[in-house]
Amino acid sequence: MSRSLVLAIETSCDETAVAVLRSPREILASEIASQIDLHRKYGGVVPEVASRNHLPRIRPLIEAALRRSGSSLAEIDCVAATRGPGLLTSLLVGYSAAKGLAIGLGKPFIGVNHLEGHLLSPFLQGPDRPLPSVNLIVSGGHTMLVQIIGVGSYTLLGRTVDDAAGEAFDKVAKLLELPYPGGPEIDRLAQQGNPRKFDLPRSMLNSGDFNFSFSGLKTAVRYLLPKLDGDFCADLCASFQEAVIDVLVQKTIRAAKRFGVNLVTVSGGVSANSRLRTKMTDASAAAGLELKLACPSLSTDNAAMIAFAALERFQLGYRSNLSDDADPNLKLV
C-alpha cells in the first residue's frame, strides 16, 4: 500500500513552520523560522509584526522542507494548514498559501484546528496507544482537559476560566522583569530555588470540577513582590511554578480516574516545562496510569503536528472546503 505524503503549514502566532510527513508518522522535514528576537523588545508578540514577517518566510521554508524531505510538490498527496485558533493576520498567511498550493497542484486541502494538532502530537512519536485518553493541553493561550475518544471525537472536561497557564508564566516573568520569553526563564531559575519558600494559592484545586484559574496566583505574586528584598527570584519562580504545576497535575490525574481512562497525554508549549514533566511522570506512575508526553520539539508550535492531524483526517476521508476562511476563534469541541 502506498504511503501518503502531507505538506503542512503553521502560522497561528509568531512561528513560521512547514513540515512534510509520510504516513503513518514519519517526519521527513520540519522547518521552523522563529520570531523571538523580533518580539523580544516588545516583551510579547505583536500581531502586525508577526504577520508581516510570515510573508517573506513561507516560500523559502516550503522549498527547504521539500529539499530536506527529498520530495517534490508533485509527490505531495495532501496540503494542510492551521485554520485556527490564533492571530487572524498570521493565520491568513499560512492558510492562504496552503490553499493556493492545493488549488495549483490539484491536491486535497485540509484546514487543521491548531488545538487538535497539539492534542494529537504525543501520538506522533508512536507507537499507537489505546484510546480513550485524557489530554492536558497547556500553552500560552489555552489550558484545557480533553477526553480523546478518537480522531475528531473529543469531549471537553475542563478549561481555564481566566488566564491560561502559559499566560500566567509570561505575566509573572514580566513582573519579575525576566527576559522574553518568560516561561523557559522561570523554568531555568526555578531549578535553583526552593518551591516551598513562598505559600502561594492553588486556585480551584478542590473545586470539584476540572476547570482551572491562574489569575489569582498571578495577583498573589504581584502583591507579594513589594514585601520582598534580597535574592528571592529563584525561590519565587520555584514557588510560583510549583503552584501552577500542582493544580495541572492533580486535576489531570483526577480526570483520568473519574472517567476510567488509563492513558494520560500532555501537550502544548508549557508541556516542555521540566518540572511539569517530572511531576506528571511521578504522579501517573503512582496512580498506575500510562503517560505519553509530547517531546519538547513537538510541544511548541510546529507544522509536524499539523501535518499529523491532517494525515489522520485525510486517511478517514475528510477534506476541507476551499471556501472556508481562517478562524481565529475556531473551537475544538
Language model features with spans:
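Conserved phosphate-binding catalytic cores of ATP/NTP-utilizing and phosphoryl-transfer enzymes
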Residues: 1-3, 112-134, 309
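Short glycine-rich phosphate-binding loop at a beta-alpha junction
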Residues: 72-83, 259-270, 292-295
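A short helix-loop
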Residues: 2-5, 11-12, 19, 29-30, ...
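Short Gly/Thr/Asp-enriched flexible loops that form oxyanion-binding sites at enzyme active sites
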Residues: 81-105, 274-283
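N-terminal beta-alpha supersecondary unit
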Residues: 4-85, 114, 118
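A contiguous, well-structured pocket-lining segment that forms one wall/lid of small-molecule binding clefts
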Residues: 72, 188-264, 274-287, 314
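Conserved phosphate-binding/catalytic loops in two-lobed NTP-binding clefts
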Residues: 111-112, 281-305, 320
